[in-house]
Regions:
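Beta-sheet entry/capping signal
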Residues: 21, 178-179
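Transmembrane beta-strand segments that form the barrel wall of outer-membrane beta-barrel proteins
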Residues: 26, 125-127, 179
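Alpha-helical hydrophobic/aromatic positions enriched in membrane-embedded helices and signal peptides
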Residues: 6, 53, 60, 90-92, ...
Length: 179
């Protein structure tokens, strides 16, 4: 089944600075099956995450609220286990677990420009790292295997870095509507 276990701690550090710390454990379990018993097959995938998040809100003045923080997630994936009945002609298969770390830092300002116009702007930098143990395969455009490289537990297989600028505007048409 699916489960989530959050822990959260909010703290007012002073009259202008607010902290929100979170730890979230999650388990997503997906299963798909066809047939029953000896004639059936089932495919199961699992995603388990450990997520630590720290957010700060700093109230600069009546018109500006600075928000900043970071997030670290450890992913454990079981991408697909096959449980085949004896009469299917298929063999049971357990896929190798995959592991990754997802990290991010951000800073943004919520600014009231006029009584009806607000702006949110900032920058988020995200990084994903796939780690071993595992094997990295490289294929050509026709799907033929070119190379394979083995990685030990905890060794980096691939890294991805992304800069994510943020900008949004909100115009209050009236008390009930905004653009």
């Amino acid at each position: 089944g699916n489960a989530t276990g959050p822990l959260r701690w909010n703290h007012i550090l002073n009259e202008r600075l607010f902290s929100n710390t979170s730890l979230v454990l999650s388990n997503y379990d997906y299963e798909f099956g066809l047939g029953m018993g000896e004639d059936g097959i089932a495919v199961q995938s699992v995603i388990r995450d450990v997520n630590v998040k720290q957010d700060f809100s700093y109230y600069l003045n009546n018109d500006n609220t600075l928000k900043l923080g970071f997030n670290v997630i450890h992913h454990t994936l079981e991408p697909g286990n096959l449980d085949a009945g004896n009469n299917t002609g298929l063999s049971n298969r357990e896929a190798d677990q995959k592991y990754g770390f997802e990290n991010a830092v951000y800073v943004q300002n919520q600014q009231q420009l006029t009584p009806k116009l607000n702006a949110n702007y900032g920058l988020r930098v995200s990084h994903f790292s796939q780690v071993g143990s595992g094997t990295k395969y490289t294929f050509d455009n026709d799907g033929n295997l070119l190379t394979s490289e083995d990685f030990e537990a905890g060794e980096r297989i691939a890294d991805y870095l992304q800069w994510e600028p943020r900008l949004s505007l909100n115009y209050a048409v009236n008390e009930m509507s905004a653009l």
